[in-house]
């Protein structure tokens, strides 16, 4: 659940089923009411399996209680969704769920990058020596953010070495760019000097998220856990139509 969201305030958790709303079961009849986003009373259930006397397993959703969910409202879903240090088998594992490569909102262009730096500073202070990077829901974003993330993950002796090549078309060779592991980007963050990173993926993992995986691979052990990623090894740039208010994300270069 997004921190501070109506769903979090209502106590909803992963695995909960919404069985009833305002006394009615969830059917086509209440669909319009569901979409209105007003305050509603919810009956919550969980799925349980029961083994019968004959050994047959049956399952179903059983109610566990009711809760009131406040009305929907605008909410900033920050890229650093969750981070923590997990003690495991004598080691300290850093876990980061990073959902978008975005530096910050328009009101503070580095706010989200500073959240990322703060997380890595805490990882370093906590003595993290293993790392899990959760990119399951990350569909890409800014290359600058990827450069920052990679710089804080990579082995310390790889600083200033080549991270990625951005190659444009023959008509835009002047835009070609080489990205490095740039320690100047770290600022208030920290380099963890890791030798291995475990990356959680789904088929929604794409674009810049895949660049991080591919560009770290020559310098450290990258272990993928999950399903195959989308396979979009290119950089895109959003173009906003001035009057019709739609956005096109056009491919602008290849990333190697």
What is each PLM-predicted segment?
Residues 22-128:
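C-terminal, low-ordered peptide segments at domain boundaries
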Residues 140-198, 236-238:
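Gly/Ser/Thr-rich loop/hinge elements
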Residues 8-28:
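Conserved PDZ fold ligand-binding element
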């Amino acid at each position: 659940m997004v921190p501070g969201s109506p769903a979090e305030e209502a106590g909803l958790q992963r695995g909960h089923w919404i069985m009833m709303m305002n006394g009615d079961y969830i059917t086509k009849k209440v669909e319009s009411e569901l979409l209105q986003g007003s305050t509603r009373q919810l009956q919550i259930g969980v799925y349980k399996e029961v083994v019968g006397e004959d050994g047959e397993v049956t399952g179903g959703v059983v109610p566990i209680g009711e809760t009131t969910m406040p009305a929907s409202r605008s909410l900033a879903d920050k890229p650093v969704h969750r981070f923590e240090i997990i003690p495991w088998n004598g080691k300290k594992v850093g876990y980061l769920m990073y959902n978008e490569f975005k530096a910050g909102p328009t009101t503070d262009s580095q706010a989200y990058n500073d959240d990322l730096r703060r997380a890595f500073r805490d990882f370093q202070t906590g003595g993290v020596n293993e790392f899990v990077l959760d990119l399951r829901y990350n569909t890409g974003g800014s290359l600058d953010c990827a450069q920052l993330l990679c710089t804080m993950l990579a082995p310390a002796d790889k600083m200033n070495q080549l991270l990625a090549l951005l190659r444009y078309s023959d008509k835009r060779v002047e835009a070609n760019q080489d990205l490095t592991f740039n320690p100047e980007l770290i600022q208030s963050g920290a380099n963890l000097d890791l030798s291995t990173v475990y990356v959680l993926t789904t088929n929604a993992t794409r674009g810049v998220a895949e660049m991080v995986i591919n560009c770290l691979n020559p310098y450290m052990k990258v272990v993928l856990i999950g399903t195959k990623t989308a396979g979009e090894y290119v950089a895109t740039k959003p173009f906003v139509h001035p009057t019709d208010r739609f956005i096109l994300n056009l491919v602008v270069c290849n990333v190697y």
